[in-house]
């Protein structure tokens, strides 16, 4: 859909008319974050055990949204790449809380593993990477949790 939006003028007009509120201004003439978001989720689900994949996806879904919301609205202390300390703290809090809530389901992960994964996800969100963070956050945080789980004996 995203590629068609960019290549087919009639479709682009339709999307602009009905869905413009969902597309950021800086994404009007390029791929939106949806493609790397779906790829990141798919790679994460394919690569890691269910609990770790679910936590990593929640870190992206909850943490990234809170970082953007809080950072844009209340971000005063700039740290890396124009990101704010307030947004980063919001990311960590949202990611950890989503992990805690995940533990209320049938999926049970050690809180220390969730905290480590949330911190890795927040650091990845701060880095000026050439790839979209929607792709990188769940893959890297999931990989970190998988590595920690395997080296500590949690599986």
Regions found by a protein language model. Name each.
Residues 2-102, 109-151:
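Interhelical loop and helix-boundary elements at the membrane-water interface
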């Amino acid at each position: 859909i995203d590629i068609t939006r960019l290549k087919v003028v009639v479709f682009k007009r339709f999307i602009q008319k009905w869905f413009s509120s969902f597309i950021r201004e800086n994404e009007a003439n390029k791929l939106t974050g949806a493609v790397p978001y779906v790829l990141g989720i798919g790679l994460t689900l394919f690569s890691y055990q269910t609990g770790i994949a679910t936590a990593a996806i929640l870190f992206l879904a909850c943490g990234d949204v809170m970082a953007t919301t809080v950072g844009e609205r209340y971000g005063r202390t700039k740290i890396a790449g124009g990101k704010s300390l307030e947004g980063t703290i919001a990311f960590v809090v949202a990611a950890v809380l989503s992990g805690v809530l995940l533990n209320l389901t049938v999926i049970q992960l050690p809180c220390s593993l969730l905290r480590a994964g949330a911190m890795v996800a927040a650091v990845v969100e701060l880095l000026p990477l050439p790839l979209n963070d929607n792709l990188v956050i769940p893959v890297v945080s999931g990989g970190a949790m998988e590595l920690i789980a395997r080296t500590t004996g949690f599986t």
